Every structure is written in structure tokens, then in C-alpha cells.
Amino acid sequence: MNILILDTSSNEKITVGLVINGKKDIRVEKIISNKTQIILPLIDKLLKKHSLKPYDLSEIQINPGPGSFTGLRIGLAIANAMSFALKIPINEENGKIILPIYS
């Protein structure tokens, strides 16, 4: 099971991680510019580090808040787009499904 972790709730940092067979690899990036310019390359870099493709993901886990409204929207929009394209669920940190599973 390969889980992508996204946390865009902070105004100061973005957290992107992978859980691969129970082992976590978390990257925290300070926000220097726009979150949208940082998050997608960060996801790509982390997937490549583990020789994974987006289609290898089985779930997306996201921090639904509280936090920066715009930051949360960015994270949820990216998670929603990936969920739709990859047909995988989006869950919050405790495993509760927060968006529908696309079929």
C-alpha cells in the first residue's frame, strides 16, 4: 500500500510524504514562493526517489485543517484532481474518507 501524504495547512511550510508498506518518508519544504509552484515538483521528486509512478499510489491522505484557507484549498484541489485521475480515495489523517471515491 502506497499512500501520499499532503499537508498544506501552514503558511510557512508544505509537508509531502509517502507511506510505503508502513514506512514513512516525509519532506517538509519552507515556503519561499507560491505553494502551487512547490507542491507538484515536491510530489514528483518524492515519487521518483522511490521509483514510483502516480498510478502506484493507493490512497491520498490529507490534513483537512484547521489552517490557512488558501493553503487548504490548494492541497485539496491537488488531492481531488489526483484522486479523480487515479481513481483512489482521499482520507484525512485518521483514515476517515473526506471526499468520494471516483469510479
Please identify what each model-predicted range represents:
Residues 59, 63-64, 70-88:
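DPxDG-like acidic metal-binding loop motif
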Residues 11, 65-66:
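Short glycine-rich anion-binding loops that position phosphate/pyrophosphate groups of nucleotides
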Residues 1-44, 48-55, 85-103:
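Oxyanion-binding and handling regions
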Residues 33, 68-69:
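A generic secondary-structure micro-motif detector
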